[in-house]
């Protein structure tokens, strides 16, 4: 019993060390080396404890940050976005709320996923946000058909965020809707602009929305 307890304590200390190092480097992420080290430490912490929401959230955010702002190689950026997607999605589908929602719906896997997302609680909004942030960045330069196939699930996640916590990350769901709709064929550009406007109205001092809008 003592050996098992000691191993548990050792693992917990190791996780806490990795998280502390990840947070330390994340706080200095304006430096490229620190941003990459933050992602590295947080990935190791997440591997040891994939059920810790705070670790998953910061890890996925670091994946998005390095993939979007730092990495210049498209394939490596995609790998980072996929890392963030996988970590957050694994967490989402493990929640009781998701599983209960999915279990009540008889249909294919996509429909079950949509039903599960529609049932999740406000507590995991940050996880939803960093999942969809990584996924939408991954899809941004993919063929139109790939983006259309993912549309229903992505829209469900964004609508769930808007219904639970619309101001999360400087009205991030509206900002993401703006970018996604700007790239989808058959969608009125005004729908994209309306979402960018809502994000700016809600968080006028967040420059990221202006930057994303300028891309389109």
What does each model-identified segment do?
Residues 166-203:
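Alpha-helical adaptor scaffolds
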Residues 61-62, 133, 175-182, 215:
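Contiguous, well-ordered alpha-helical segments that form the cores/surfaces of helical PPI scaffolds
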Residues 41, 157-160, 176-177, 181, ...:
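Short, hydrophobic/aromatic alpha-helical segments in well-folded domains
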Residues 195, 203-208, 215-216:
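Outer membrane beta-barrel transmembrane domains
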Residues 1-167, 202:
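N-terminal alpha-helical interaction modules that lie
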Residues 57-58, 129, 172-176, 207-213:
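Alpha-solenoid helical repeat scaffolds
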Residues 36, 82, 197, 213-215:
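Amphipathic, non-transmembrane alpha-helical secondary structure
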Residues 33, 102, 188-189, 210:
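Secondary-structure transition/capping residues
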């Amino acid at each position: 019993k003592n050996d098992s307890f000691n191993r548990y304590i050792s693992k917990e200390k190791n996780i806490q060390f990795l998280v502390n190092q990840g947070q330390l480097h994340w706080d200095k992420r304006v430096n490229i080396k620190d941003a990459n080290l933050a992602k590295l430490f947080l990935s190791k912490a997440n591997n040891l404890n994939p059920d810790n929401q705070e670790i998953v959230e910061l890890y996925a955010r670091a994946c998005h940050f390095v993939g979007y702002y730092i990495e210049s190689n498209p394939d490596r950026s995609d790998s980072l976005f996929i890392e963030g997607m996988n970590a957050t999605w694994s967490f989402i589908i493990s929640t009781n709320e998701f599983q209960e929602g999915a279990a009540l719906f008889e249909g294919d896997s996509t429909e079950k996923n949509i039903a599960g997302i529609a049932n999740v609680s406000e507590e995991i909004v940050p996880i939803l946000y960093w999942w969809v942030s990584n996924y939408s960045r991954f899809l941004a330069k993919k063929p139109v058909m790939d983006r259309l196939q993912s549309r229903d699930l992505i829209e469900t996640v964004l609508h769930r965020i808007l219904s639970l916590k619309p101001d999360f990350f400087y009205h991030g769901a509206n900002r993401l809707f703006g970018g996604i709709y700007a790239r989808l064929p058959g969608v009125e550009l005004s729908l994209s602009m309306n979402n960018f406007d809502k994000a700016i109205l809600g968080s006028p001092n967040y420059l990221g929305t202006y930057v994303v809008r300028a891309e389109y």
